[in-house]
Design a protein with these regions (language model features):
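Bacterial N-terminal signal peptides that target proteins for export
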Residues: 2-13
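Accessory terminal and edge-of-domain segments that mediate assembly/interaction
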Residues: 31-384
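Bacterial N-terminal signal peptides
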Residues: 11-24
């Protein structure tokens, strides 16, 4: 009798334990037990996830060549292949799907070329209810034209002063007054480089300078690839020593515009235009087509608490020079570059190498950097 009762009690206890375990497993391990399942079933485009995906770093690239993997690399490919950006997240409201490393929280995007696409892609991501971007750092990593007076192709440039090259008045040079040196001048002014200019309303954006300086100090000694063929391109620039240096890391101003311009005259304009709007606080070093659109969207998103504008960084690497070497015409040089940028491979490698130093530091010290933006000189990098 006692033995039978003991057996029944033991069986009952075992059944209760098994039921509890099954209940617990049912509650803790849903059918969609992977991030991929969650994205596919619970995070459809245009809808909110049951729990937003927390992003630590948004990697902003502008274009890719061909496929995202396995062929000639544009701006996105090396990041996707080397940083485990393997989880595709459909993003039909923009130019290109997103790719996430669910283990690190690094999200890669390709905005498309030009300020219009970069602004709308950034806004689309910032307002996407699937993501929590409130503590995310943004790293723009793109190729650029580079001023031979400042650096060489393959060099990587951190920028905080972003000047727009589109907003303005313009008169054809053949119709401008004889005492003008250019037909392009600021809106609401009377002549080129009029000192009585209005406050910028899209002509100039300034990112977190302290964060820019922190990123530069962290990466300034990063060895950059000096690939075969670069020296031959550099050596043609006999009148500008920085253009002949092997690739290096520096800081400098950035000019963004929808027109791919080239030549000595426009290069001089770019230098004066950046100096004019920054009032001498920065010089022109790189030229591309997106930053003022991207950061305009960031500023709007910051106003509603979707992102933090102070966590935005710009890194550009020179794929080509913004003017030809001595003895070569502007049209001839531009058309040659259109056949393939001399520094494309070196520039995307430099972007990856330099940008990865910053990304690795942020991830390694996330417990700190989630709440404290680096840039305070009293903050020692976790890697030291």
């Amino acid at each position: 009798m006692h033995r039978t009762l003991s057996v029944r009690v033991a069986v009952l206890v075992a059944l209760l334990v098994m039921a509890a375990l099954l209940t617990g497993l049912a509650g803790c391990t849903p059918a969609r037990d992977s991030m991929a399942d969650v994205v596919e079933q619970d995070c459809l485009p245009g809808t909110a996830c049951s729990k937003p995906i927390e992003i630590r770093i948004v990697l902003v690239t502008m274009f890719e060549i061909g496929e995202d993997e396995g062929d000639t690399a544009g701006e996105f490919q090396l990041w996707k292949e080397r940083r485990g950006l393997s989880l595709r997240i459909p993003f039909p409201q923009s130019h290109h799907d997103l790719y996430l490393n669910p283990d690190t929280g690094v999200l890669g995007m390709v905005t498309g070329i030009g300020t219009a696409k970069s602004a709308t892609a950034t806004m689309a991501l910032g307002l996407d209810p699937r993501f929590d971007l409130r503590k995310a750092y943004w790293l723009v990593a793109g190729i650029a034209g580079i001023d031979p007076a400042d650096a060489s192709i393959g060099s990587a440039v951190w920028s905080a002063h972003l000047v727009d090259g589109d907003l303005g008045h313009e008169i054809d040079a053949r119709e401008m007054p004889k005492d003008w040196e250019t037909g392009y001048f600021a809106r609401y002014t009377r002549f080129p480089y009029d000192p009585d200019k209005p406050e910028p309303t899209g002509e100039l954006f300034v990112t977190n300078i302290a964060l820019r300086d922190w990123a530069f100090e962290l990466t300034r000694n990063t060895p950059l690839p000096d690939l075969p063929g670069l020296a031959a391109s550099r050596d043609k620039y006999t009148e500008t020593e920085p253009a002949r240096r092997p690739p290096f890391v520096l800081v400098g101003g950035h000019l963004a515009g929808m027109t791919f311009w080239h030549g000595e005259i426009l290069n001089e304009w770019a230098n004066r235009w950046v100096d004019y709007w920054t009032e001498g606080q920065s010089d022109f070093v790189t030229s591309a087509m997106e930053e003022t659109g991207t950061f305009q969207a960031i500023e709007y998103l910051d106003r509603v608490g979707r992102v933090d504008r102070d966590r935005f960084m710009v890194l550009r690497a020179g794929s080509n020079y913004t003017m030809p070497p001595p003895g070569v015409g502007a049209a001839e040089n531009l058309l040659a570059e259109n056949e393939g940028y001399a520094g494309l491979q070196a520039s995307v490698e430099s972007l990856y190498l330099v940008g990865s130093v910053v990304i690795d530091e942020l991830l390694r010290g996330w417990e700190r950097y989630a709440d404290v933006i680096p840039g305070d000189s009293r903050i020692t990098p976790v890697s030291e």
